[in-house]
């Protein structure tokens, strides 16, 4: 029977000092011997997805203590990618993922916690905590802050839904009046919560449901809705149940590595492809798989992208649907239910929402779907749960409203979530491309690509940084038919693998959204749409071919064939590579780029791998 990890610091005379310190935190004599449950919160006043999390730890703690545990909360950092966008702050976003993972590991291991609840929400926080949870492999439950309500405003006597990207595009479009731009800006982000579309934050919070590590509704229930309160309380109860199963019953199915196994990662990626999730999720799933010692790679993603249909189309891929609409249609469980009926899901994997009593099928995703898939459940409480909707009242307070949709969206032919027969497309919303530009692959969010752009041939317009590309786009250098190439923005070359939301938004604002393509060894915001190809691997700084592209080179993109090709002969490419090598210390570095890189970022860059490895640390450099 496993011994409580916390016994290391609470048992024996030699731990008298540690017990004295535990007492100073409020632990009583009769508490010693109870499991200590760490609560990793990410409250901050910098991020709308996190401004309402201050009291969430107390909610979780109350449920833990009622169930017989000791709850101890700590905080991690949280970077807002939208606020950090378009300037040097974005260099810190992806590296913060590793910092968050390390900080959770440090706190949990330093204090010998027995189990963990992760209160996350936005872009790098959920992935960072996920990496830590799989690294630690102690009982864990994830509960996020939830998505914000979609913005709404009236323009030309028409009510339209909005999000952050609409504000950015309007602000850069000279054809939009100052008055209309201001209306959009003030209406785009009306409440607390993660941005309202299927951007990175919401994509990752949905994927934790598919991985089996969070409760149904975690990815889709609005931050403002009163029903979300129960998710925090249930997270506390569930983590205690998992801890008891592991420490009292020696049930290893309660551990995250036995829940988030290879099949669960396939489920998560299947969901991601079906819902057209952010391309960043590929980066984060690959990183999490490495922490879990799961052999899940770009090759698996490529294979699955050819099999999984696109069942759910959400902003930024369409202005019609946001996360509040996904929830009304049954949330993640609704999408998983359709995937199951299409024969594309592993339902025999364990899930934290299911009790494992030892009987066949218990504790698995199959039993969770039977209860929470709105197309098969007979539970009226579940149907009521998924009818939770927006109030349309600007607020930064959680649980501030209890509005309901008049009905569920069960229309699987023309609704927000479709059955396989009526899919938005029979190929999913993400694809892996490869070719001489990206020998180890690159990613495109096909959900956001217009059908007319599935194949594209154009001339390279090369920039050594995102800043130069933005200046070139706004300055009129980029014209229809160009393939904008932004390089030296990968994990090592940036460093930090910046998001390219401004270049793609500015292309749209200049009417070039469908007339140009963009490829980069950087990445894209979850809010990006259009022919935007990122994660080119190897990156320029690691000797990738993207560093050898010259202005005017012909680039051929064929998404149906999963191909991206630089139409330059091997002889010429080899000559360019030799010329690059001849530069010595200046080889594989951006020409003329002026950028301050701090010591912290330089330390990150020294160990960073390319995107096809999840941009995690190169373990070979850390081995004894």
Swiss-Prot record:
Keywords: 2Fe-2S, Amino-acid biosynthesis, Branched-chain amino acid biosynthesis, Iron, Iron-sulfur, Lyase, Magnesium, Metal-binding. Its cofactor is [2Fe-2S] cluster; Mg(2+). Pfam families: ILV_EDD_C, ILVD_EDD_N. One of its GO terms (cellular component) is cytosol. One of its GO terms (biological process) is isoleucine biosynthetic process. It catalyses: (2R)-2,3-dihydroxy-3-methylbutanoate = 3-methyl-2-oxobutanoate + H2O; (2R,3R)-2,3-dihydroxy-3-methylpentanoate = (S)-3-methyl-2-oxopentanoate + H2O. Pathway: Amino-acid biosynthesis; L-isoleucine biosynthesis; L-isoleucine from 2-oxobutanoate: step 3/4; Amino-acid biosynthesis; L-valine biosynthesis; L-valine from pyruvate: step 3/4. The modification N6-carboxylysine is found at residue 124. PROSITE patterns: ILVD_EDD_1 (PS00886), ILVD_EDD_2 (PS00887). It comes from the Bacteria. [2Fe-2S] cluster binds at residues 122, 195. Binds 1 [2Fe-2S] cluster per subunit. This cluster acts as a Lewis acid cofactor. Mg(2+) binds at residues 81, 123-124, 499. SUPFAM superfamilies: IlvD/EDD N-terminal domain-like (SSF143975), LeuD/IlvD-like (SSF52016). It is an enzyme of class 4 (lyase). The active site is at residue 525. PANTHER family: D-XYLONATE DEHYDRATASE, D-XYLONATE DEHYDRATASE YAGF-RELATED. Functions in the biosynthesis of branched-chain amino acids. Catalyzes the dehydration of (2R,3R)-2,3-dihydroxy-3-methylpentanoate (2,3-dihydroxy-3-methylvalerate) into 2-oxo-3-methylpentanoate (2-oxo-3-methylvalerate) and of (2R)-2,3-dihydroxy-3-methylbutanoate (2,3-dihydroxyisovalerate) into 2-oxo-3-methylbutanoate (2-oxoisovalerate), the penultimate precursor to L-isoleucine and L-valine, respectively. Belongs to the IlvD/Edd family. This is Dihydroxy-acid dehydratase. It comes from Shewanella baltica (strain OS223). The gene is ilvD.
